[in-house]
Amino acid sequence: MPYIITQSCCNDGSCVFACPVNCIHPTPDEPGFATSEMLYIDPVACVDCGACVSACPVGAIASDTRLAPKQLPFIEINASYYPARPIDLKLPPTSKLAPVIPAAQVHVRRRPLTVAIVGSGPAAMYAADELLTQPGVWVNVFEKLPTPYGLVRAGLAPDHQNTKKVTELFDRVAEHRRFRFFLNVEIGRHLSHDELLAHHHAVLYAVGAPDDRRLNIDGMGIPGTGTATELVAWINAHPDFAYLPVDLSHERVVVIGNGNVALDVARLLTADPDNLARTDISEFALHVLGGSAVREVVVAARRGPAHSAFTLPELIGLKATSEVVLDAGDRKLVEGDFATVSDSLTRKKLEVLSSLVDSSKPTSRRRIRLAYQLTPKRVLGNQRATGVEFSVTGTEESRRFDAGLVLTSVGYRGKRIRDLPFDEEAAVIPNDGGRVVDPSRGRPMPGAYVAGWIKRGPTGFIGTNKLCSVQTVQAVVADFNAGWLTDPVAEPAELAKLVHARQPDTVDSVGWRAIDAAEIAQGSTEGRPRRKFTDVADMLAVAAGAPPLRLRALS
């Protein structure tokens, strides 16, 4: 009865260190960890202890006897990561454990290490967690929205509630007595980098990649065009996108790009609104989706099936919940790739693609069509989008799709931060292992650090940020221990005074807990995990009704 890792795996790696027989791979010290689509349990080596189940922050692990029907393909996926062995073979238990990355040890100085973290998504919260393992370290997290947790709150599809459970880990971090939230505070607007550094030994930026990579073709930008990430933010009640004018009065939507976000959008646009009503989806978005006329979403990729950007777990999940089809031409492309590709993961994707329904078969369900070798040329329409024209990649042929909504899903892009260097081409802050590097001098900027997507680019999954943040924290601690970080010039109590003077509507940890509790209470009456606020004013009103946070002295 081995345990199985399923679709919602976040690559956090906590399960690896909980396993007493080192049967979960790749481990964080192995080369494939940073790029692996998920982690895998060796069914032959697993001793059925279940330690990994409680360690997983997103509930992605279950016994093979307790899997839902849609999770059964993950039995083979886990097993196929390992060499083929006789079915009755059982490896003897081993005492070898995955090597744990030791926490950086902070040396005692006159002033305890105090770090400002800008951003509150996974990279930020993993960094805070790592810092707070050391006695005496203080962490202040600054976030421009009144609510924390970045893309976990506003970028994960609402029907992926298991994955959103990682916020329970972040909540525990935020409850630490040496942790403070300064929410609804924008660095670069309310406070500068230098002002943060005057109150902290170090400033760690974990702001993600908030912009979209843009597709520069004629017609993008007219009504009826947008980006998949904007649509996901709209669906998730992000206050900046809560009332996006999304027109779903036409029968077809085209999504350009075929990564996981593209699949999320396609799945949500074709989902039964009654099912979405049991999630934390935005009320406004749910109303619009309830009146949708969309019958088909075309997910168009420039390259062939073997180069599909989506992950295998997401493809399997999509097939289990949605009507996914291929036309005859794309099916031939799948067959051609399968004959030439040797990589086992890619071959598994191609196997799943080859099993999809033929698009010529009639269906009463809304459907998702995966299309390949289509290079976008222009959006059709004058006053608003009426379709999109593609060239068939590598040929002189053109292909058109009528569509009332055209979305691009070609990736995220980091954004310049005032007072810090920025690599425009890579869209990251130049750094060496997390230390921000001034390109003009070729040396690190004292006290400035980065983690997450703004450090390495928009790659990996939620848990990938954990190892990335640990590396940066080790750099912070090493520099502090070496005496390279200047003690704050301001007294600790002055920080809160300065923040509230600049932004009277600052939301602290107590205010966030009040917002969180109110959303959960509103949702519980409707059988939902929460009903999110969409207006900042409503969030601030709830937070203002919370008792003030009693500040603790640094010690």
Swiss-Prot record:
Reactions that this protein is recorded to catalyse: 2 reduced [2Fe-2S]-[ferredoxin] + NADP(+) + H(+) = 2 oxidized [2Fe-2S]-[ferredoxin] + NADPH
Pfam families recorded: Fer4 (PF00037), Pyr_redox_2 (PF07992)
Cofactor(s) recorded in Swiss-Prot or TrEMBL: [4Fe-4S] cluster; FAD
SUPFAM superfamilies to which the protein is assigned, alphabetical: 4Fe-4S ferredoxins, Nucleotide-binding domain
Binding site for FAD: A123, E143, L151, I187, W453, G460, F461, I462
Entry GO MF terms: 4 iron, 4 sulfur cluster binding; ferredoxin-NADP+ reductase activity; metal ion binding
Gene3D superfamilies: 3.30.70.20, FAD/NAD(P)-binding domain, NAD(P)-binding Rossmann-like Domain
Cofactor note (record): Binds 1 or 2 [4Fe-4S] clusters.
Region (Ferredoxin--NADP reductase): 115-555
Binding site residues for NADP(+): R213, N258, G259, N260, V261, R302, R303, E314, G460
Keyword Iron: yes
UniProt xrefs under InterPro entries: 4Fe4S_Fe-S-bd (IPR017896), 4Fe4S_Fe_S_CS (IPR017900), FAD/NAD-bd_sf (IPR036188), FAD/NAD-binding_dom (IPR023753), Ferredox_Rdtase (IPR055275)
Record-annotated 4Fe-4S ferredoxin-type domain positions: 2-29, 37-66
EC numbers for this chain: 1.18.1.2
Binding site for [4Fe-4S] cluster 1: C9, C15, C19
Record-listed [4Fe-4S] cluster 2 binding positions: C46, C49, C52, C56
Record's keyword annotation contains Flavoprotein: yes
Keywords assigned: 4Fe-4S, Electron transport, FAD, Flavoprotein, Iron, Iron-sulfur, Metal-binding, NADP, Oxidoreductase, Repeat, Transport
Family: In the C-terminal section; belongs to the ferredoxin--NADP reductase family.
Protein name in the entry: Probable ferredoxin/ferredoxin--NADP reductase
Originating species: Mycobacterium leprae (strain TN)
